A protein has these predicted regions:
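The AdoMet/dcAdoMet-binding core of the Class I SAM-like
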Residues: 42, 46-171, 179-182, 190, ...
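N-terminal auxiliary segments of SAM/dcSAM-dependent transferases
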Residues: 1-30
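Short amphipathic beta-strand/extended segments with alternating polar/hydrophobic composition
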Residues: 36-42
């Protein structure tokens, strides 16, 4: 069996070890040795983009925010779905992840970060959401395991009522937010509904051949009365 190659690593703000690995042509991100995502299981990341940016609701010059760059699969799909006048902001907490995408992952998705539609913000996606009302047509959030299981405790504020209200205000009327979740979160779904979103819970497989949809994507549509 071919060994895992440790390509690069860094430390998160709380001191955890975050690393990029390659094995038999596939790439993986790990936190303290535990796999967070891999290029062999990207179905749910692509679905996240499909649900946030449905082609039938395409706008001429959409502004999209992606929370979490990861291996770049959600970004690639958003660029495929939006037109040439789109502005796609990517908020990534770790500058090293941005650098790894440029240095190691070009063979996966191409030079995504060189696309003129892409704007990279190195920092917390919460700061992007806080900067203005009715700013985004779509928001994709894949920054943690979901509303209750956190790798980074500070991400909890995105899923609490105040955070959800802030997301609602940052969307344009008719805008969508899509949250990736490792599992079902009915309490969070209710929280989105209380904030005024029309909510869909969408099952998501980790990979094409999976027998069941282990993950969930929660899609909130901003409806204005």
């Amino acid at each position: 069996m071919k060994p895992f190659r440790n390509l690069a690593e860094t430390r998160t703000p709380d001191g955890s070890r975050f690393s990029l690995h390659e094995h038999d042509g596939q790439y993986f991100l790990k936190l303290n040795g535990r796999q967070l995502m891999g290029s062999n299981s990207t179905v749910s990341e692509v679905l996240l983009a499909d649900l946030a940016c449905p082609p039938h609701q395409r706008r001429e010059k959409p502004r999209v925010l992606i929370g979490g760059l990861g291996l770049g699969f959600s970004l690639r799909r958003v660029l495929e779905l939006t037109g040439p006048k789109a502005i796609v902001e990517v908020a990534e907490l770790l500058p090293e992840v941005v650098a790894w995408n440029r240095e190691f992952l070009g063979g996966l998705n191409g030079p995504l970060l060189d696309d003129p539609r892409v704007e990279v913000f190195t920092g917390d996606v919460f700061d992007c959401i806080s900067k203005g009302a009715a700013h985004y047509d779509a928001i994709l959030l894949d920054v943690d395991n979901g509303p209750t299981s956190f790798v980074r405790r500070q991400n909890a504020r995105l899923y609490k009522r105040n955070g959800v209200d802030l997301i609602w205000r940052s969307l344009k009327p008719g805008g969508r937010v899509a949250f990736w979740s490792a599992e079902r979160e009915p309490a969070f779904q209710a929280n989105l509904q209380r904030a005024g979103f029309r909510v869909d819970e969408v099952p998501a497989k980790a990979h094409e051949r999976a027998k069941r949809a282990a993950h969930r994507i929660y899609v909130g549509l901003r409806q204005d009365s």
